């Protein structure tokens, strides 16, 4: 599944300090995004190329040939959130998450509670004489690692609650419209009740952190390991 979307996610993470992340995300949004998710490549291959192998054997809009591989979408969600593009990350999450696709179930067709391996891309159906008539149709239910990867994307990258060597790191990358969020996380023998406030309505950035009412430096919560519940108050800014 080495593709435009995978290369894009790597560039966002590797080259963030050089500003390549913003250019890459803009190109991804312009060239790969659709209302049903991100296609792997664009345009689709229309004939077989021996040097490219399997990718060019599939009909346009299916599988690796410009299909919407949901597994790869999760990697772009992670990359967008890492780059601080919280609105973009959540938009991509909403395009493929089953909870958001009920209104298009007549197009999607697969079970409304599960991820499929892929969704028909913009070119899907052109092989049977009617361009794009399978665009948005889900395929191969359950046959994917998307659920696990999107759990990582939403919890560790968008909500920004992730394990760190020194403790529990809180670094949200959320839509600017959000006032904040709450979460409970069990971590290394303790429970953390986390409340994040976003008064400035930004996408990313932590201004202050209180743990059990006491200010700490940075945004990594110590691992108490005492079996107790600790309150964490985070203000973005």
Which sequence ranges carry the predicted segments?
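Single conserved hydrophobic/aromatic residue that forms the stacking wall/gate
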Residues: 1-13
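Contiguous, well-ordered alpha-helical segments that form the cores/surfaces of helical PPI scaffolds
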Residues: 9-10, 71-78
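Alpha-helix C-terminal capping segments
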Residues: 14-15, 82
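Carboxylate/His-rich catalytic cores and anion/metal-binding grooves
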Residues: 18-37
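Conserved active-site and cofactor/substrate-binding residues in soluble primary-metabolism enzymes
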Residues: 19, 23, 71, 87, ...
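Non-catalytic C-terminal accessory modules of carbohydrate-active enzymes
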Residues: 30-34, 46-49, 57-66, 75-237
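Short, surface-exposed loop/turn segments at secondary-structure boundaries that line and modulate
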Residues: 54
